[in-house]
């Protein structure tokens, strides 16, 4: 049986340098290879003309460059593109490209499904299958960059920002997420600024501390409720890591970080008559008084079978005004791609559910009980 080839997209620069050293080559060859892979999108070793023929033959014998394929895509009226990415075994994750005047953002997935059970999120209702590999994470950027067009003459890439807000909880896949981020930030990789790579988390506290000890990127936190009682229902990981523990971990992260400029981005999905009253706005402002933040209010994006509705514009406006009275920076997020189910909370993909959550969900949908405000 032939030895399985090494997928070079699974290795950050440290891993590539170790590989070249083991092959009896100079470590700087890793820098050359990364530039071909990530600046120019080249996967054919024969096109890597500043690498000698003998080494190209060695690489072809032992290594490969394999990114997951795009199965299909949909384009929204606002220019947003949702990609279905085939990650093997008949399963797909979803990746969303969001073009704006001053940036082009790619929302990438970190898991096939999600192990958390946030009750308002379509991905969470699908259950969980597995973590994505490094090559499957960076491969989303690589493949979409090919779709959009690498600038092969200049090395300019079509994606300026990456947000890890797709399917899955990134901090439950740190083993693969951290080297993937290393590749995003590396000057020979995708060469993104640490302020242009955002990791979002629902509050896996120990993993947030590990992330802060190893990487400095922008942080977004999914709060969605101003107290533990409601958050236990909406974001069940809160039962293990309550709000005060989560906020303390956020402050520890901010103390180590330059990318966040001293404040975290707080994500708060607006659920009609669930978490959107003015009393809850006051409660949220008091909760965050010791944690510097800017607050993104996200109009809920309904999906089939969801027990929640979207807050009215008037309720969102009143909620926002209360927060601003406390001197907080508040942004009401403009919904993008909702006509193709590409908006926040709508990503579902095609998941073989190891948790059997879909079957459980059918029995539990009518049992969700939250205080109406």
From Swiss-Prot:
Record keywords: 4Fe-4S, Cytoplasm, Disulfide bond, Iron, Iron-sulfur, Metal-binding, Methyltransferase, rRNA processing, S-adenosyl-L-methionine, Transferase, tRNA processing
Co-factor: note: Binds 1 [4Fe-4S] cluster. The cluster is coordinated with 3 cysteines and an exchangeable S-adenosyl-L-methionine.
Superkingdom to which the source organism belongs: Bacteria
Major site of localization recorded for this protein: cytoplasm
EC numbers, comma separated: 2.1.1.192
Keyword Disulfide bond belongs to the record: yes
One GO MF term: rRNA binding
Keyword flag Protein transport: no
UniProt: S-adenosyl-L-methionine binding residues: 168-169, 200, 222-224, 301
Cellular compartments per GO CC: cytoplasm
Catalytic center residues: 94, 344
Subcellular localization: Cytoplasm
GO biological process, one term: tRNA methylation
Disulfide bonds: 107-344
Cofactor(s) this protein cannot do without: [4Fe-4S] cluster
Binding site for [4Fe-4S] cluster: 114, 118, 121
Catalytic reactions of this protein: adenosine(2503) in 23S rRNA + 2 reduced [2Fe-2S]-[ferredoxin] + 2 S-adenosyl-L-methionine = 2-methyladenosine(2503) in 23S rRNA + 5'-deoxyadenosine + L-methionine + 2 oxidized [2Fe-2S]-[ferredoxin] + S-adenosyl-L-homocysteine; adenosine(37) in tRNA + 2 reduced [2Fe-2S]-[ferredoxin] + 2 S-adenosyl-L-methionine = 2-methyladenosine(37) in tRNA + 5'-deoxyadenosine + L-methionine + 2 oxidized [2Fe-2S]-[ferredoxin] + S-adenosyl-L-homocysteine
Homology family: Belongs to the radical SAM superfamily. RlmN family.
Other observations noted: Reaction proceeds by a ping-pong mechanism involving intermediate methylation of a conserved cysteine residue.
HAMAP family noted in UniProt: RNA_methyltr_RlmN
Functional summary from the UniProt entry: Specifically methylates position 2 of adenine 2503 in 23S rRNA and position 2 of adenine 37 in tRNAs. m2A2503 modification seems to play a crucial role in the proofreading step occurring at the peptidyl transferase center and thus would serve to optimize ribosomal fidelity.
Protein name: Dual-specificity RNA methyltransferase RlmN
Record organism: Shewanella loihica (strain ATCC BAA-1088 / PV-4)
């Amino acid at each position: 049986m032939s030895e399985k080839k090494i997928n070079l997209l699974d290795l950050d620069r440290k891993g590539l340098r170790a590989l070249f050293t083991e092959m009896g080559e100079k470590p700087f060859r890793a820098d050359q290879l990364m530039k071909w892979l990530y600046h120019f999108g080249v996967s054919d070793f024969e096109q890597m003309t500043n690498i000698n023929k003998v080494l190209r033959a060695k690489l072809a014998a032992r290594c490969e460059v394999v990114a997951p394929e795009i199965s299909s895509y949909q384009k929204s009226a606002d220019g947003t593109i949702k990609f279905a990415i085939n990650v093997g075994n008949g399963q797909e994750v979803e990746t969303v490209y969001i073009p704006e005047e001053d940036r082009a953002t790619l929302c990438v997935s970190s898991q096939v499904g999600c192990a958390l059970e946030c009750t308002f999120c379509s991905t969470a209702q699908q259950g969980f299958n597995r973590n994505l590999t490094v090559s499957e994470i960076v491969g989303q950027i690589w493949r979409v960059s090919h779709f959009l067009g690498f600038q092969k003459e200049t090395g300019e890439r079509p994606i300026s920002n990456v947000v890890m807000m797709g399917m899955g909880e990134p901090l439950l896949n740190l083993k693969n997420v951290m080297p993937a981020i290393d590749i995003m930030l590396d000057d020979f990789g995708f060469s993104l600024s640490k302020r242009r790579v955002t990791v979002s988390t629902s509050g896996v506290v120990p993993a947030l501390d590990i992330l802060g000890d190893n990487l400095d990127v922008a942080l977004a936190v999914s709060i969605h409720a101003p107290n533990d009682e409601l958050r236990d229902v909406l974001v069940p990981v809160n039962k293990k890591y309550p709000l005060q523990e989560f906020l303390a971990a956020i402050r520890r992260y901010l103390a180590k970080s330059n990318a966040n400029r001293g404040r975290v981005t707080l994500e708060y999905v607006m659920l009609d008559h669930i978490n959107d009253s003015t009393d809850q706005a006051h409660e949220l402002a008091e909760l965050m008084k010791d944690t510097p933040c800017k607050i993104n209010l996200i109009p809920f994006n309904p999906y089939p079978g969801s027990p929640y509705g979207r807050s009215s514009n008037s309720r969102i406006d009143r909620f926002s005004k209360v927060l601003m009275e406390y001197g907080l920076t508040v942004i009401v997020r403009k919904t993008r791609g909702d006509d193709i189910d590409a908006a926040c909370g709508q990503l579902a993909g095609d998941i073989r559910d190891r948790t059997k959550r879909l079957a459980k969900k059918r029995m539990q949908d009518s049992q969700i009980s939250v205080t109406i405000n």
